[in-house]
């Protein structure tokens, strides 16, 4: 059995689903209350931090709750998590996936396969190989962007407790798209255009993506589309932030027009 298959698999990018070591996906109805899912997702999101006290978790997840209802909801949700992810655990045995020390809680990462962790590892390996072996770098970066199916925890888009992690993952994914597009620019400008377009679907204000797209169109001999790309970049930046493109982008436009 592969390492991934023997672990609890958690998918957070563009979806939220959990696959048990038995290969079966945990159904939505099995989780019961939404607060059970919220607590598990919170523990996933904060897994790289130190263990958090129960009161800290409650105040971040359900700030509107009083102490009594918060304690009750936490207890019910934690019981629900253990019941769903370790259905065969006896009541007296220690939980495999959640480390509890007194009133602090943390996920046991060594027993989990999490797509966003794998994405980050592949991006790091791609960046490490960038200068010595661009071919290997491209392989890792392609694997990473293929794993990125969409926003981190898309069903919690308005939850403050996962906003920072969502933005962090998006930024490193955008950087991976840009690096790949740069690697492809000279040999396959059409692929650079595709990659930069994918980056702009994640964030249509990402100026690096417009710039690479301009360069790629210019290399293909399509100056009108290169200029049109600049105009779109300028329009988006003005609308969203009230700013103009960077000097490097303006200079690229001047160079393209002069050819």
PLM region spans:
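Short N-terminal amphipathic alpha-helices
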Residues: 50-56, 68-74, 92-97
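DNA-recognition element of transcription regulators
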Residues: 30-41, 67-89
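Intrinsically disordered, charged and Pro/Gly-enriched terminal/linker segments
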Residues: 30, 66-68, 75, 90-91, ...
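Conserved amphipathic alpha-helical interaction elements at protein-protein interfaces in regulatory
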Residues: 45-46, 63, 87, 239
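Short boundary/linker motifs that mark transitions into or out of structured domains
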Residues: 1-39, 96-104, 111, 150
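Short amphipathic alpha-helical recognition elements used for nucleic-acid or partner binding
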Residues: 27-61, 81, 205-206, 210-211
């Amino acid at each position: 059995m592969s390492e991934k298959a023997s672990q609890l698999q958690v998918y957070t990018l563009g979806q939220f689903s959990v696959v048990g070591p038995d290969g079966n996906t945990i159904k939505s109805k099995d989780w019961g209350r939404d607060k059970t899912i919220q607590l598990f997702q919170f523990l996933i999101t904060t897994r790289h931090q130190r263990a958090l006290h129960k009161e800290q978790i409650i105040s971040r997840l359900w700030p509107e709750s009083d102490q009594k209802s918060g304690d009750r909801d936490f207890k019910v949700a934690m019981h629900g998590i253990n019941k769903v992810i370790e259905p065969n655990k006896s009541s007296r045995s220690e939980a495999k996936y959640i480390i509890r020390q007194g009133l602090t809680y943390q996920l046991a990462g060594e027993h989990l396969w999490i797509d966003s962790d794998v994405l980050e590892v592949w991006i790091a390996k791609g960046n490490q190989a960038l200068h010595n072996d661009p071919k290997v770098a491209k392989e890792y970066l392609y694997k990473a962007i293929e794993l990125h199916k969409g926003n981190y925890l898309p069903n919690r888009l308005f939850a403050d407790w996962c906003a920072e992690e969502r933005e962090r993952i998006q930024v490193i994914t955008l950087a991976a798209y840009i690096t790949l597009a740069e690697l492809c620019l000279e040999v396959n400008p059409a692929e650079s255009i595709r990659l930069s377009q994918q980056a702009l679907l994640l964030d249509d204000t990402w100026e690096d993506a417009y710039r690479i797209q301009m360069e790629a169109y210019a290399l293909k001999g399509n100056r009108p589309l290169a200029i049109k790309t600049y105009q779109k970049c300028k329009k988006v930046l003005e609308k969203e932030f009230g700013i103009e493109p960077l000097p490097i982008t303006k200079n690229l436009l001047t160079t393209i027009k002069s050819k």
